[in-house]
Regions:
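Nucleotidyltransferase catalytic core that binds NTPs
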Residues: 1-180
Length: 180
């Protein structure tokens, strides 16, 4: 957050990922919301169910609604290097890139995949140096910056494989949802 000078981060928990098999690849929505809230506690990260409430299925549609609803706010899309490798499979990914700047956060083991990704081929014309990332509010989209951060070798995929029932501890009906 500091590298980008962000006031806060909105963590949009998706009710469903069109690129994943819901039954196999995703834990129940309520458990993912509760888990995200636990991880974001006491931070400037706001966990949101906006996508569920908006009824959107695709990120580009969600972002259009967010930009309409909060026209005076400045937004930057944060994504991990692991996501860049499949970004070209997202609905209207070029349109998404034209909506707001993108910051790509380093992920151990994904640097080569991210740099070789089909979407990166198109986005290479819009790359901004990481040292200028704090000035992202001055950028016109499309704009993308690849940020090198201290490595976090935690792999959510590996953690889920080690404990397939991890989400059960977050399945309490008492947990609420935060609405930005």
């Amino acid at each position: 957050m500091d590298r980008l000078g962000l006031d806060e981060v909105w963590w949009l928990v998706s009710p469903g990922n069109p690129l994943k098999d819901q039954a196999v690849d995703m834990a129940p929505y309520a458990a993912r919301m509760a888990s995200a809230r636990t991880m974001a506690r006491h931070s400037r990260i706001k966990v949101s169910d906006f996508e569920l409430r908006a009824g959107t299925r695709y990120t580009v549609d969600t972002l259009r609604q967010i930009l309409r609803r909060w026209p005076r706010h400045r937004f930057i899309w944060l994504m991990g290097e692991d996501t860049v490798a499949q970004f070209h499979q997202w609905k209207d990914w070029r349109t998404l890139a034209r909506l707001l700047p993108i910051a790509v956060l380093s992920r151990p083991g994904y640097d080569d995949d991210a740099r070789a990704a089909r979407a990166t081929g198109w986005l290479r014309w819009f790359v901004r140096p990481a040292r200028q990332a704090v000035n992202w509010t001055e950028w016109s989209a499309p704009a993308i910056s690849f940020l090198r951060l201290p490595p976090d070798r935690t792999s959510a995929t590996r953690l889920r494989a080690l404990n397939p029932d991890w989400h059960r501890r977050f399945s309490s009906p008492r947990r609420g949802i935060v609405h930005p």
